[in-house]
Amino acid sequence: MATLGNLLAPDLIQAGSCWQLCADVNGYSRSDGESLTTQACHGRRFRILEKQRKRIAIQLLEDGYRCWLELEAVLGRAERCEVWRPSPLSATEIERRLPGVLAWSEIAQQRPNVYLWGGTTEPDMDCSGLMQMAFASQGIWIPRDAYQQERFCQPVAALPDDHSLLRPGDLLFFGTRRRCTHVGIHLGEGRYRHSSGADHGRNGIGIDSLQWSDTHPVACHLSLIHI
């Protein structure tokens, strides 16, 4: 019987067992093919859901995200652990940690990087991966994808060209009324940091300003401090 601290081996792969990564790994949306959907860094925990020939279906414990991991990537690189979930944080505690979130995102921008769809480990990340890792750096776990982050947060009643209700650390969501497709973090005075692809004029992390008359307007403005 496996005990805590055992490294993951073929005979220990059981549905429901929990493990902690000893290395960064890629997560895929399907049981085969090059379909990167997320990444999980060293130290993250997961529950095994099922096993296929070359991949295992897992659920990351910090955010509940489901994906497939290559067996070769995790065998001998994950330790048995107990079931775990993040502790709830008060709005006051989250607000206290926001300067650290912003500082982490600034450091990430300063490192050479490119936009990577599904990227959630440094240096190359997608928009929501950057947000998740910035908050996780301060012990705050938010959902993985932009549309999930939008649903997770509390709306702020911001008015066009009036940034007075937006605070540094608020998340800004872009897209349509039907679905959010992009996210950035507010720095103050309408400026925000985000990771975007080359088709948006960048290929990595940068700073832009809100333009309410843009043809791709911000769909809504949400704040983590109002959880």
What feature does the model see in each segment?
Residues 143-213:
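...with weaker cross-activation on analogous glycine-rich loops/strands in unrelated enzymes
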Residues 15-27, 136-153:
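Short, basic/aromatic beta-hairpin or loop at an interaction surface
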Residues 20-42:
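Beta-loop motif signature
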Residues 100-125, 144:
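Active-site nucleophile-His-acid catalytic modules used for acyl/amide transfer and hydrolysis
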Residues 121-138, 142-145:
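Active-site nucleophilic cysteine motif
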Residues 225-227:
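Conserved small/polar residues in nucleotide/adenosyl-binding loops
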Residues 39-72:
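SH3/SH3-like beta-barrel superfamily modules
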Residues 1-12, 60-108:
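Boundary regions of SH3-family modules and the immediately adjacent low-complexity/disordered segments
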